[in-house]
C-alpha cells in the first residue's frame, strides 16, 4: 500500500480545519438568528424569520458563487444577524431616519460577526474584508461585494417582493425595483429575469426596466 504523501496530509488537515471553522461560524450565526421572535411559515412550520433569511442568502450564494470564499459565505449568512434588535421604528420614519438606521445596522451586523470569526481562528485581514462586505463598500468595483449585492437583490425579488409590493404604492415599488436592478451585475439581472414572478410582480419589473 502506497504511503500518504506528508505534504498532502498537511494540506488535507488544513482543508478540514478551514471547513470546520467555517461550519462553526455559520452554526453560530444560525443559533443567533434562531432567537428572532418574529416567526414565518416554511412549509407550514413556524421558523425564525432571520434564520430563514440567512438560509436563503446562503442558497442563492451557492448558486451564483459555488467556490465563494469563507468571508463571502459568512457575510451572506450573517447579513441580517440579530437584525430584530435594531427595529426600524426606533428611527424617524423619513429618508434621513432610514439612512441612519441602515448605517447603524451595517456596523451592528459586522460587530456581531467579528467575535464569531475571531473565536474560530479567522485573522484580522479576513475580518476587515467581512466588515467591508457587510458595510457595502466596493459594490461595482470588487467582485465579492458585487456578488453579495446580487444575492441580496435576488433574495428580495424571489422571496420578499410579493409581500413588499402589496404594502406600498405602485410608483414607489417601481422606483425601488429600478434602483434594485441598478445595483445588480448583468449576471444578477439575468438570474432575476428567470425568476417565476407572479403576473402583477412581473408587470412592475417591466415598468421599472422601461422607465
Region roles according to the model:
Residues 2-104:
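Acidic/His-rich, divalent-metal-binding segments that scaffold phosphate/diphosphate chemistry
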Residues 5, 17-21, 44-48, 55, ...:
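Divalent metal-dependent phosphate-bond-processing catalytic cores, especially two-metal-ion Mg2+/Mn2+ enzymes
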Residues 70-88, 109, 113, 132-138, ...:
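His-Asp-centered metal-binding catalytic motifs of divalent-metal-dependent phosphohydrolases/nucleases
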Residues 89-131:
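Helix-adjacent hinge/juxtasegments
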Amino acid at each position: 500500500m502506497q504511503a500518504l504523501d506528508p505534504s498532502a496530509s498537511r494540506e488535507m488537515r488544513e482543508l478540514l480545519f478551514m471547513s470546520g471553522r467555517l461550519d462553526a461560524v455559520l452554526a453560530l450565526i444560525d443559533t443567533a438568528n434562531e432567537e428572532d421572535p418574529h416567526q414565518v411559515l416554511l412549509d407550514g412550520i413556524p421558523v425564525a424569520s432571520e434564520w430563514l433569511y440567512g438560509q436563503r442568502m446562503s442558497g442563492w450564494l451557492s448558486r451564483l458563487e459555488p467556490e465563494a470564499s469563507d468571508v463571502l459565505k459568512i457575510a451572506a449568512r450573517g447579513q441580517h444577524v440579530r437584525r430584530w434588535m435594531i427595529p426600524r421604528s426606533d428611527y424617524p420614519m423619513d429618508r434621513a431616519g432610514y439612512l441612519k438606521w441602515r448605517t447603524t445596522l451595517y456596523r451592528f451586523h459586522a460587530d456581531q460577526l467579528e467575535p464569531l470569526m475571531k473565536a474560530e481562528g479567522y485573522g484580522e485581514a479576513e475580518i476587515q474584508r467581512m466588515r467591508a462586505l457587510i458595510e457595502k463598500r466596493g459594490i461595482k468595483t470588487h467582485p465579492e461585494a458585487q456578488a453579495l449585492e446580487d444575492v441580496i437583490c435576488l433574495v428580495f425579488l424571489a422571496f420578499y417582493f410579493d409581500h413588499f409590493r402589496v404594502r406600498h404604492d405602485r410608483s414607489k415599488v417601481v422606483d425601488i425595483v429600478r434602483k434594485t436592478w441598478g445595483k445588480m451585475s448583468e449576471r444578477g439581472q439575468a438570474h432575476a429575469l428567470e425568476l417565476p414572478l407572479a403576473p402583477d410582480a412581473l408587470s412592475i419589473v417591466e415598468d421599472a426596466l422601461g422607465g
